[in-house]
UniProtKB/Swiss-Prot annotation:
It comes from Staphylococcus aureus (strain NCTC 8325 / PS 47). GO terms for cellular component: cytosol. CDD domains: HAD_SPP. Keywords: Hydrolase. This is Uncharacterized hydrolase SAOUHSC_02465. The keyword NAD does not apply. One of its GO terms (molecular function) is phosphatase activity. The keyword Transcription regulation does not apply.
Length: 271
């Protein structure tokens, strides 16, 4: 039997913020299933997230997660970490591919200043940036008019592209700690992002798209979920537009993942 690839967004997908006592039994059931499938050499697991690697580790510790996904692609999949001999190790191969083109914070600041001046708006850093980052993320608070928001953000993406930079935007998720009525603005190298990470794993393990199952809950999952034949938006998602586009999990969070992973590996989605 050929291996299957299981891909998970992290915040509000693989990890529920505000996990309570009732959720823990469902979490343990999910981990038990993933551990069994991994030990039986049936699946490869990977987390694709916009969060930093340390943030993922801290959140896993909060709920005492014991299962270790083989790969964690952090910082909007601009960094790759692999579980090896009891610890996560960053992939130098992936890093070289990501940093094959210039990616400078000074250039990104210039791009944001240009759009800020043109539309009289502000972009707020989401965290303190360090040197040589591969992911710079900002908040943009809604103007109160969706069409106006889209006009500004699409202008940002176009202008960034003109400067040979990749910018993405999606609705912020308050359940994951984001502010209400805001957008995430993400800058990454061109060789990064959840879709890029997905295709990297497909090549690495020679896995066809029909053998991949993906889960997500928000706008930065849209591109990679759209690429897959077997993709689920979490039923707990707050993105109403995406709910119209993707199949929803039967249950939220851990229960939903467990059910659909079981069905997937049992061949119920094969055709």
């Amino acid at each position: 039997m050929s291996k299957r690839l299981l891909l998970f967004d992290f915040d509000e997908t693989y990890f529920k913020h505000n996990t309570n006592e009732e959720d823990l039994s469902h979490l343990r059931e999910m981990e038990k299933l993933l551990e069994k499938l991994t030990n039986n050499n049936e699946v490869i697991t990977a987390v694709l997230t916009g969060s930093t690697f340390q943030s993922v580790m801290d959140k896993m510790d909060q709920v005492n997660m014991t299962f270790k996904p083989l790969h964690i692609f952090s910082d909007l999949s601009s960094k790759m970490f692999t579980w090896n001999n009891g610890e996560y190790v960053e992939s130098e191969t992936y890093k070289k591919k990501v940093l094959s083109e210039p990616f400078l914070f000074e250039d990104i600041e210039d791009i944001l200043r240009h759009i800020s001046a043109q539309y009289n708006v502000e972009f707020i850093p989401q965290r303190a940036f360090e040197g040589n980052e591969t992911h710079y993320n900002f908040y943009f608070h809604s103007t109160g008019n969706h069409n106006n928001d889209s006009r500004i953000l699409e202008a940002l993406v176009r202008y960034a592209n003109d400067q040979n930079y990749t910018a993405r935007f999606s609705r912020s998720n308050p359940l994951a700690g984001d502010p209400e009525n805001a957008y995430d603005i993400d800058f990454t190298p061109s060789n990064a992002g959840k879709l890029y990470a997905t295709q990297f794993l497909m090549r690495k393990y020679n896995i066809p798209v029909k053998s991949i199952l993906g889960f997500g809950d928000s706008g930065n999952d849209e591109a990679y979920l759209s690429y897959l034949e077997h993709a689920y938006l979490m039923s707990n998602s707050r993105d109403e537009a995406l709910k119209q586009k993707f199949r929803l999990t039967k249950y939220p969070y851990y229960q939903g993942i467990t059910l659909h992973v079981k069905e997937f590996v049992e061949g119920k989605y094969d055709y």
